[in-house]
C-alpha cells in the first residue's frame, strides 16, 4: 500500500479496516487516497487506537484486588512497535491521534467524524466479556471528505 499509485478522481469512496497502523509512511498513502477520490468523496477507516498501540508491553495488568488496567507508556514517542500477534511477530506504527488528524488535514481532507470505539451498555449486557473494552479504546474510527 505504501507504494500504491491510484488514478486521479476515480472513486467516490475509499474504505480501510485495521490496516493503516501497519504503514510507516501514512502521509503518502493519505495523499494518494485524496488524489484518487472525486470531489466530495469520502474516506472511512478504522485503525487500532493509539492507546492500544503505544505501550511497550501491551496487555492487561491485574492488581492484587483483581482490577484490570491497561498500561499506557510511550504515547508521545511515535514509531514502530514490534508485537506478538497470533503467534507471529508483527510491526505496527504507533501515531498519536493528533498526528493522524494532522496527516489527514495536510493531505487535503476535511475530518467529519472521529470515534474512539467502546461497546454499548447493551453489547456488554449481551456479552459481559466486552466490559473490559470500556476501560480503553481499542479502535479509532474516522470519516473524512475530499
Language model: regions and residue ranges:
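Adenine-nucleotide cofactor-binding loop residues
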Residues: 1-2, 51
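A short SAM/SAH-binding and catalytic strip from SAM-dependent methyltransferases
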Residues: 12-27
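A short glycine-rich, Lys/Arg-flanked "PGG" loop and its adjoining helix->strand segment in the class I
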Residues: 27-42
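Conserved class I S-adenosyl-L-methionine
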Residues: 42-80
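Short alpha-helix
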Residues: 79-80, 91-115
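Core SAM-dependent methyltransferase catalytic element
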Residues: 107-109, 127-146
